Amino acid sequence: MTQYIRKLLPLIVLLCVSVAGSPGAWATPTPAADKIKVVTTIPDLAYMVGEIGRDLVEVKSIAKGSEDMHSIPMKPSYLLLLNRADMLFEVGFDMEHAWLPDLLYNCRNEKIQPGAPGFVNCSARIKPVEVPDQPDRAEGDVHPEGNPHYNTDPANGRLTAKTICDGLCGAYPDHAERFEANLEEFLERFDRKLADWEILARPLEGVRVITYHRSWSYFAAHFGLEVCGEIEPKPGIAPTPRHMAKLLRKIRDEKIELVIKEDYYSNKYPRFLKEKSGIKVVTLPNMSGGRPETKGYFNFVEHNITSILRALGKRVLTPEEIEKELNNE
């Protein structure tokens, strides 16, 4: 598959270059002609780039919020975006290793290659978890640099915003003052939301869960949930009957309350566990924009907290009640 892509994409590059002056993915009205064209790998990064860059940037995400970041389908339109981009922001920790290197190899855009000012790895400030001692593909789809799903933890989202600002300032120092002012205003709003979420999520402290994939380790650590196992016996590997039987025993013995799965995973195995044990199941997006109500990073985080609370039958505080709690602290 990789060899096929490498043969095909250079032909598409020629097409991209030949139509560079015609309407396309980056075609915009004349007033926007001088905007910094930014591509991100996920919607969360696009949202933050938009908040920090504002009217100075035009930003597009390759992945949709409903997609599995480990297996993004290859499309010629992605190559066109990268060919015309001024900057590229990636998640990092090898999240995009299965598809982004081929796109970068073939896009013929030196501005966004690793090491160039236009390439930003957004994991720079993140402390990774689950870093394997000796990475081995026999252990499944492991990430040598650690778990890449750090975006689910809003504290990491805050750090990511700072890294995005660093990248924009480094590539476009003439606009650094505006980027930094926008970041400061964004972080003020972020901190207010983070305080709200800490109160909203208090009932999640100590709740024991099983996840489908290791997508929720950072979220769980931040809000006090205990991840007791995964439906996948190894990352990216489908469960065997023996593994499912083991999970059933664990659910009963350890009083595990909830299964968390993503939209793009099959309902087959969570449904089996629910039917056999009565455990509750919640389906969540692990990127913003996966559903209409999760457009924007703030909505994404809040949706996941409230969805888990409701799945557990716990009460969701109103904004007025949260404000009262904040005032009492």
Predicted segments — roles?
Residues 9-22:
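Bacterial N-terminal signal peptides
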Residues 1-5:
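N-terminal secretory signal peptides that target proteins for export/translocation
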Residues 26-329:
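Extracytoplasmic metal-acquisition and chelation regions
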Residues 6-7, 14, 73, 216:
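Intrinsic structural disorder/low-complexity segments
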